[in-house]
Amino acid sequence: NTYLWSEAVETVGRHQANIVAAVFGKGAAPIDSGKLLVKLCASCCRQENVLGVYTSGTVFEPSFYLRSALVMRDGDLPVLDWIYFGLYRSDNGISGYTYGLENFGKREIEVLDSNTKPVELRDFLFNIAYYILDNDMEFHDGETIGFSEHQKLPITLSAGVAVDGMSFKISYRKKPVTKSK
């Protein structure tokens, strides 16, 4: 199931075979192994009859996967090929989570009950995941994070809501706009 590709179930339901791709490297850095796996899968996406790429708990459209892999040409990380960014409505707003950070030895991230738009929350989660992977970051319970000098978003470690195990929760809410008189 994916909000990125509405025809995913119908399309991949027609598959007649599959290829399992994996990269094993004793002592290899997870980022390097991940890049190699993306290159391998992206080359498969160039084949005429490929229907989808299953990774990070979802199916990606081959053209999306390939476009997302091409960022490596500029030295960027193919985070969209590694991490799924799940979004769902909750009683108090929109919530989101990552799925795939554990493949790099990192805890998954969740944002609960945000008052942002879904695309803003997805972009926020993307930026956090990219930051974690690009800088080999480790969060700790009680820390804060921000993308500006004044932004301090609390980080807590607790049982996952949308993901298994423990996850880091980041409180991400926009301040209400107050109208001046």
Where are these regions (language model features)?
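Aromatic/basic-lined ligand-recognition segments
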Residues: 58-181
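Internal, hydrophobic cores of structured domains that mediate oligomerization or house catalytic pockets
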Residues: 1-83
